[in-house]
Design a protein with these regions (language model features):
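Ankyrin repeat A-helix N-terminal signature
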Residues: 9-15
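Alpha-helical linker/edge segments of TPR/alpha-solenoid repeat scaffolds
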Residues: 16-20, 28, 32, 46-58, ...
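Helix-start (N-cap) detector for alpha-helical repeat units in TPR-like alpha-solenoids
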Residues: 61, 95-98, 132-133, 166
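Structural marker of alpha-solenoid helical repeat scaffolds
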Residues: 90-93, 127, 161
Length: 187
């Protein structure tokens, strides 16, 4: 897929939403006679993609991650999430994949989508089970979903990996307090 533009890869994956989002950010290609969203999708369906190039994959992945980071800083969490999704298409290493998943989890969390944030955080923990940040992301998503007991477990797992992590310790205290309050409301 590398050696192709992100918009071509999105078209090849059948992601019209991603093509529409990338369209205003992509310079027109002289190889496409119909520079439109439908034209790009049609071209890729008919001609396919160019062979992969690892260096180009790394470059495109880095560009998408940078755009995602910028979108996140601007509060454009959906755009950031979609850019991280695009970066996943460009052969990240296992560690880079975990980082992208952690960042996409935070983006979807800030966007208010707890289920998607939890899904990414869970995959992140599978990819890097000894990474405290993965535990933190999972706990944060569980907090948004009001699954406080499980959030406590995730934060505690992270503290086992990094006992001096103040963010995890604070998050665990907040989760324990939320769990306690939830139990008292049930009575």
């Amino acid at each position: 897929e590398c050696g192709n533009t992100p918009i071509e890869v999105a078209a090849s994956k059948g992601s019209r939403d991603m093509v529409e989002m990338l369209f205003p950010l992509t310079s027109p290609s002289s190889t496409l006679s119909d520079w439109s969203i439908d034209g790009i999708i049609s071209h890729v369906k008919h001609f396919g993609l160019k062979p992969r190039d690892k260096q180009k994959c790394a470059k495109i992945r880095a560009e998408l991650k940078q755009k995602a980071s910028e979108a996140f800083k601007e509060g454009k969490y959906y755009v950031a999430s979609e850019m991280y999704t695009g970066a996943m298409a460009f052969d990240p290493s296992p560690d880079d994949c975990a980082t992208i998943l952690a960042n996409r989890s935070l983006s979807t969390l800030r966007g208010g989508n707890g289920r998607a944030a939890l899904s990414d955080a869970t995959m992140c923990r599978m990819a890097r089970p000894l990474w405290p940040k993965a535990c933190y992301r999972e706990g944060a998503a569980l907090m948004l979903l009001k699954r406080y007991e499980r959030a406590c477990e995730a934060f505690a797992d992270g503290l086992k990996l990094d006992p001096t992590n103040g963010d995890l310790a604070n998050a665990l205290r907040e989760a324990q307090e939320a769990a306690k309050n939830a139990r008292s409301r049930e009575k």
